[in-house]
Amino acid sequence: MKRVAFIFSSAPHGSAAGREGLDALLATSALTDEIGVFFVGDGVFQLLPDQRPGAVLARDYIATFKLLSLYDIDQCWLCADSARERGLDPATPWVVDVECLAPDALRARLHEFDVILRF
């Protein structure tokens, strides 16, 4: 089976991209164990704890990221530079366990995958 990478690069509540990406990620986990999840750019906001999407009349799907370990999805990486550029500390207690990597190391990991889906 091919190795599939999911890249989350958009903010969580400005569009449905994050929610749709998470749905696709969970569905794909039924087909393969070779899944990697990458959070880059505004996608780092997907993992912030204590979000209140109801304040902007958005659906709260962020807690669903906590289910990734139940689906045996444990290869998750976050771009440390993206976090810093947005005023976030890479050591933040994110909603899932992620490994913070420099852009070059993140790119090297991404090249290990056969299929890349971006949300």
From Swiss-Prot:
Source species taxonomy: Bacteria, Pseudomonadati, Pseudomonadota, Gammaproteobacteria, Enterobacterales
Listed GO biological process terms: tRNA processing
Location(s) in or outside the cell: Cytoplasm
Gene behind this protein: tusC
Main localisation: cytoplasm
Protein name: Protein TusC
NCBIfam families the UniProt entry points to: PRK00211.1, sulf_tusC_dsrF
UniProt cross-references to InterPro entries, sorted A to Z: DsrEFH-like (IPR027396), Sulphur_relay_DsrE/F-like (IPR003787), Sulphur_relay_TusC (IPR037450), Sulphur_relay_TusC/DsrF (IPR017462)
Protein role: Part of a sulfur-relay system required for 2-thiolation of 5-methylaminomethyl-2-thiouridine (mnm(5)s(2)U) at tRNA wobble positions.
Pfam families in UniProt: DsrE
Domain of life assignment: Bacteria
Subunit field text: Heterohexamer, formed by a dimer of trimers. The hexameric TusBCD complex contains 2 copies each of TusB, TusC and TusD. The TusBCD complex interacts with TusE.
